[in-house]
């Protein structure tokens, strides 16, 4: 039968187990998010970080067999290490990305993931042994510590998704979680102080770590911002981290640029070239374009071009991230570019997944414009599949027209023609177009309809800055190094079952 002191100590151990588990899972998913943002390909990065973290836990658990005495002070020092290393992890990652040679950031991220995983793996066996040492039977100590650990894992994941990432960002989150680890260590240190030699020395060291973490919490994000500025050619004037992505706006004199997770979305100097080709051939191919659907395009620029047509009665814009739409409606630089298009009474904005929207809606559209980010992760890749384009076709009126941004036929030749082949596989007639956009390079589009498309007779009935009637046929001319005749490459449709486009995309862009 446990006495009151042993009961109190065992409760401390169980609570400590749950809290450090919360911290561990937050660090685990934080490293995945860091890898996804900085290195790209979210599925790959989350897979690697989770695997490395679990491997580290296994290594730590194996090493813990050597820890049989002085368990509390060993636990305290493990928490000190997790707090310091984990707390500064995001801050250092941004610094390495800005200043170190290519590849160093990946090596650092994977190393830090393994180290934090190993430290986390040591914690549980120590706590189980300590609970057993104070009188709790082994079966009870194991069950209760593991219960606290697993329950903490769920709580940590939920907290990261709904609290830490959207409200604190990656740098502050790491420092905050490090402070939580440190707090657990200091509480345990105090409550078990009678068992610990040189208590004051350990407490002072913990205090120093606390000062460093608090300094990082208040000043680290600003310094990391300066690191991140090195990744952009122009000064950053706006940066936020939404629930879905990091949104960055830069300015150099009159050049306003929007980046999502570090990928350029447009430059105000030449965006008209991109958006006019995206919008006007499709709109001009329909006699009376009354009902228009835009998938993506949360910056509002495509909507601005669509609203030039007097026949348009309804524009539905579907963009997953409400933060992008909010920025487009409130930032004075973006408002100047999109002319407040998203606030027009004809425009209805829906913040939801494009795939889900098409599954749910019963509407038919005269024109559908697909202005989505490139297929650089699994979530986006599904929006470049035969299944997705089949849904698009099913909501296209018989005489309607589809236009899809399809990456670069020069830099990502195989990607561009795979997207074209995928759209063709839905029994739509396609026309391939491309245009030079200085900030992007040569950029490609795929136009599709149930009817034959003839750009030779097409006329644009609205004002433009770049595109003319005479130019439209020229958009379909591809050079030998960018056409469909790709040596040693088999074109096949991208599907949900065989999502090979993402691998093609990674390979195409790895040198750019």
Curated annotation (Swiss-Prot):
**Active site residues according to the UniProt entry:** 371
Cysteine pairs bridged by disulfides in the record:
none
Record protein name field: Polyamine aminopropyltransferase
Q: In which pathway does it act?
A: Amine and polyamine biosynthesis; spermidine biosynthesis; spermidine from putrescine: step 1/1
**Could you tell me which species this protein originates from?**
Oceanobacillus iheyensis (strain DSM 14371 / CIP 107618 / JCM 11309 / KCTC 3954 / HTE831)
Catalysed reaction(s) here are: S-adenosyl 3-(methylsulfanyl)propylamine + putrescine = S-methyl-5'-thioadenosine + spermidine + H(+)
Gene Ontology BP, a term: spermidine biosynthetic process
In the Enzyme Commission scheme, what number(s) does this protein have?
2.5.1.16
Q: Which family does it belong to?
A: Belongs to the spermidine/spermine synthase family.
Q: What does this protein do?
A: Catalyzes the irreversible transfer of a propylamine group from the amino donor S-adenosylmethioninamine (decarboxy-AdoMet) to putrescine (1,4-diaminobutane) to yield spermidine.
Encoded by which gene?
speE
């Amino acid at each position: 039968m446990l006495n009151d002191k042993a009961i109190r100590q065992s409760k401390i151990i169980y609570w400590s187990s749950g809290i450090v588990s919360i911290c561990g899972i937050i660090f685990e998913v934080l490293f995945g998010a860091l890898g996804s943002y900085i290195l790209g390909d979210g599925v790959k990065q989350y897979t690697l970080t989770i695997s490395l973290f679990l491997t580290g836990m296994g290594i730590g658990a194996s090493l813990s067999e050597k820890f049989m005495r002085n368990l509390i002070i060993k636990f305290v020092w493990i928490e000190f290490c997790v707090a310091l290393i984990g707390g500064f992890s995001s801050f250092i990652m941004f610094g390495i990305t800005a200043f170190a040679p290519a590849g160093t950031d990946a090596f650092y991220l994977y190393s830090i993931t393994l180290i934090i995983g190993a430290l986390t793996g040591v914690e549980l066996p120590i706590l189980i042994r300590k609970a057993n040492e104070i009188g709790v039977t082994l079966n009870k100590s194991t069950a209760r510590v593991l219960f606290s650990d697993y329950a903490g894992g769920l709580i940590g994941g939920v907290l990261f998704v709904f609290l830490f990432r959207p409200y604190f960002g990656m740098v502050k989150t790491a420092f905050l979680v490090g402070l939580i680890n440190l707090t657990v260590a200091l509480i345990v240190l105090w409550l078990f102080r009678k068992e610990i030699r040189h208590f004051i020395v350990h407490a002072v060291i913990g205090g120093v770590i606390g000062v460093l973490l608090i300094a990082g919490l208040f000043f680290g994000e600003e310094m990391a911002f300066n690191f991140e500025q090195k990744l952009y050619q122009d000064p950053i004037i706006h940066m936020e981290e939404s629930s879905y992505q990091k949104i960055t706006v830069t300015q150099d004199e009159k050049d306003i640029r929007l980046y999502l997770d570090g990928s350029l979305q447009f430059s105000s100097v030449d965006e008209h070239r991109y958006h006019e080709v995206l919008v006007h051939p499709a709109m001009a191919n329909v006699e009376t374009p009354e009902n228009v659907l835009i998938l993506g395009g949360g910056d509002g620029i495509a909507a601005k071009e669509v609203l030039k047509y007097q026949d348009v009665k309804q524009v539905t814009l579907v963009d997953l991230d409400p933060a992008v739409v909010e920025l487009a409606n409130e930032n004075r630089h973006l408002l100047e570019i999109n002319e407040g298009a998203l606030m027009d009474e004809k425009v209805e904005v829906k913040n939801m997944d494009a795939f889900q929207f098409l599954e749910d809606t019963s509407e038919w559209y005269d024109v559908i414009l697909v202005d989505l980010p490139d297929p650089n992760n699994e979530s986006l890749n599904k929006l470049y599949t035969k299944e997705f384009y089949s849904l698009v076709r099913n909501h296209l009126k018989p005489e309607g027209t589809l236009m899809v941004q399809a990456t670069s036929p020069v830099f990502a030749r195989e990607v561009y023609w795979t997207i074209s082949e995928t759209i063709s596989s839905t029994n739509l007639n396609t026309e391939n177009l491309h245009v030079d956009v200085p900030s992007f390079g040569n950029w490609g589009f795929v136009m599709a309809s149930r009817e034959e498309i003839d750009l030779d007779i097409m006329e644009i009935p609205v004002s433009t800055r770049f595109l003319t009637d005479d130019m439209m046929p020229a958009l379909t001319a591809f050079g030998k190094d960018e056409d469909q005749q790709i040596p040693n490459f088999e074109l096949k449709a991208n599907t949900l079952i065989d999502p090979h486009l993402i691998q093609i995309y990674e390979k195409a862009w790895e040198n750019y």
